[in-house]
Amino acid sequence: MVSSSSLMPDAPNLLFTNAGMNQFVPIFLGQEKCPYQPGRAADTQKCIRAGGKHNDLEDVGMDTYHHNFFERLGNWSFGDYFKKEAIEWAWELLTEVWKFPKERVYATVYKPDASKGDPAEFDQDAYDLWFDIFKAAGLDPEVHIVYGNKKDNFWMMGDTGPCGPCSELHIDLTPNADTRGAL
């Protein structure tokens, strides 16, 4: 477990640490060698969001989960494992270790909007992995896989730099668990 880095990042373009990956940027960019062996890390990073791409200020106070200060949990692989293992382990953690009811779990998968010039391609790998997991759990993948756009499911570090599709898990916490994936 890697300790939270300072809220005042060593980065000229950031006022505050706004994401769990900030302290790992030099590793992602190949400027530093990964100090973790194997190439894995987990962290709980204190974050402040006060502007920029992931600005949550307009949502603070409008619901129960948007805050401008929070702790972001993260697990990171630096060439040690990839999407298949990450998705399988996330499912295992939620449903077998933490015992969340499987029927309340939904996964998002990146689906670009070509008319908006969204980058990259549909994340077929993540879709196929989630499809198999939900099917094996006796759940309808077409209900439990939700398509996300560039804003929600394409991770970018500024206008240039490391980027790519991401997949997120959401838990339906409504009393009747009847959102059917309407996140």
Protein language model regions, located:
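Structured aminoacyl-transfer and RNA-binding surfaces used for tRNA recognition/handling
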Residues: 1-183
